[in-house]
Amino acid sequence: MRLDTNSNVDFKAFESSSSSSSCLVKLDNLATWGGSQKTDTRLPITDYSTLGGPRHNRSPFPLSKDVNNRLVIWDGDMTTLDVDAITNTSDETLTESNIISERILAVAGNQLREELSTNVKECRTGDVRITRGYNLPAKYVLHTVAPTYREKFKTAAENTLHCCYRNVLCKAKELNLHTIALCNISVHQKSFPADVAAHIALRTIRRYLDKCTLQVVILCVNSNERGTYEVLAPLYFPRDQLEERSALWQLPKDIGGEFGEPQHPDPDRQIRIIRNPQHSVHMRHGHTDDDSDVSPHDMEGNSSDLEYGAKDMNGLSPNSYSSGLQTQLQRDLDRQHLLSDRPRAGVYENVISEGVEGIEHQERYERLLRRAQVEDLTEVSGIGCLYQSGVDRLGRPVIVFCGKWFPAQNIDLEKALLYLIKLLDPIVKGDYVISYFHTLTSTNNYPSLHWLREVYSVLPYKYKKNLKAFYIVHPTFWTKMMTWWFTTFMAPAIKAKVHSLPGVEHLYSAITKDQLEIPAYITEYDMATNGLHYFNPVPTAS
């Protein structure tokens, strides 16, 4: 089945390159899933109706010839397809080299590379960015970033992969595109289970085609993946009554929501072990085990901290966040309620309550500490982005982090973590403060939220407890938004300790000028932006 395209954009370069292409693949030459049954050489499907009861009482994905005729599963080179758009999977900087992205960039030419580096620059995990196709037969390329899969965070990874597929398909609909070629978005994430990824892809595509009746989706797979998709496709796209009936036994219990999003109905997957239960209890009552500093800005009555965010970075309302975040909040409330009446215990009782996971967590940190003490970390320490700079007015060590000097995309992040542990381990035994300078940073300086979450989870409780203040100097709106999101959903234990300051002089309320050693570019930027003597510091009395 072939639908006529209707694009309002005329790319002369595209027309000339595609007309001269000798290997252009038209949609008319591809067999749809509905027509593939005639040439299917596999053994007849097993009739499960003679076995025990099915998992589902009625078909969640009923037989639809119309839907089947708008799906193509194809083993071939996506860059040769004469379609409205193809997809590219990469990392957040869109510079990752994998078999799909390399092929797309090679055929599209340097113009696509230039657009990615100058205009697009980045794409966050689960989001989608659009560029022209240039020398490709396709008019557009839709770029997305697949999540990294870890068993501990599999729910988040599965939700995010669904978002990748759904956002790409919704963008195609928004642009009035009729034919779109999807790659296996998680193909370069070797840790992502192939069968789980296939279920998510097929389920999301099926829900999309049910709702959007004018689109044709070509799922491009390689020879190794094709077998998996051809085995699972009949569960979501049955071609006859026998396949539809057999799917009642073979489909997983989680058949997704309205749009195919994972729902994980198994309550066992919603239970997490609490590393610091007493700390969670204290957070529930509105205070921590220690008093956090008051922001100098708060003393002025003009706090620059971001308290609320009505929308996320894509302009979506909070209700449109993935269900995983809402579930996470409910879990935290439930577990805090269960622990609210638990009395304080001694050291040994705490070890027991934290369980095996807490012990393993401590052992992991100790292994990293031993590595940090023996490995050569000069490539990180030589950068000069993280160091101790004197003490604050209360005699507490001040840790300075210069964001501009942190090459997040060109550094071994594991060694960066080791250096962080080596520097801070002897300091965090007592109270300390951190001053982060966001001055003149760019996307190349931003580590992923996933890595930040990993670092936060690795560091023991003493890091959070003894941190008295975390100052962010020269924040941007994006910094404030992400800080609010991170401290709300990932690190609530330190939320009250984070203070955003518009200028260096605001720090002088907590840290005297002679104790603050910072690079010249920070002070020069501060003077150019705020002028001189714009704030009269009042020492904090605490």
Swiss-Prot record:
Domain CRAL-TRIO residues, every copy: 373-530
Ranges of residues in domain Macro: 58-237
Matching InterPro entries: CRAL-TRIO_dom (IPR001251), CRAL-TRIO_dom_sf (IPR036865), Macro_dom (IPR002589), Macro_dom-like (IPR043472), Macro_GDAP2 (IPR035793)
Region feature (Disordered): 277-304
Source taxon at top rank: Eukaryota
Biased composition (Basic and acidic residues): 286-300
Transmembrane segments: none
Matches recorded under CDD domains: Macro_GDAP2-like, SEC14
Similarity remark: Belongs to the GDAP2 family.
Name of the featured protein: Protein GDAP2 homolog
Originating species: Drosophila pseudoobscura pseudoobscura (Fruit fly)
Organism lineage: Eukaryota, Metazoa, Ecdysozoa, Arthropoda, Hexapoda
